[in-house]
Amino acid sequence: MPSITTTLTTVATFSDDNLKRYLLRKIWDENKPKLAIIMLAPSEAAGIELDNTTLLVLNNSSRLGYGGVDVLNLFATLNDCGLKEAEDEDPDNLNAIVQSVQKADIIIYAAGVGKAKSKVFQHRQEQVLTALRPYEDKLHCLTNESGRARLQHPLSPAVRTWHLSPLKVSELIAEPEKKEPKGTDTKAKKGRHKNTAKEAE
């Protein structure tokens, strides 16, 4: 009788006080592409145990042909989906996100929409998405088959079976303002436009 042996390697990175988890890495096939998924906040399930979210992430990642996933979050504090312990900034977490997405073949932004009106969520989302701009060509979100339910968290019933949709950072945060080059005389430029218009008349 034929048998199949599989190995699931797990690596988890925590803060020194073990109150934050910056990275949960699951690898089952080194020869296949890897993805990074950014969600809201981590649970304590980081080893043998799998919470519902991680289980859905692993199943869907495997079905889509990936061989590993880096599970990341906007906020690193364990079991804080209510964002009661949320900080304005977390450089260590942001650094972990950037290091992961640099190596990933695809990035999935899946923080969900449940906290979209929260100021601390908006602030952290802007920080993270700004850092993701250089990797925007790899950025996607979860959607349903019709493509109407975008920006979903993996626990959303609408995306239990994943469909990926390209995501532009500008869909969620404003584009940075373009600064005028030094020495540019804006008033003079406006005046020249006016004169040109008169001459054209």
Describe these PLM feature segments.
Residues 85-201:
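Glycine/proline-rich loop-helix segments at beta-alpha junctions forming the active-site rim
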Residues 15-106, 110-119:
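A polyanion-binding, active-site-adjacent surface
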Residues 9, 33, 130-133:
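Compositionally biased amphipathic helical and low-complexity segments enriched in hydrophobic
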Residues 1-14:
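Helix-enriched interaction subdomains in cytosolic or periplasmic regions
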Residues 10-11, 67, 147, 195:
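Generic secretory/membrane-interface signal
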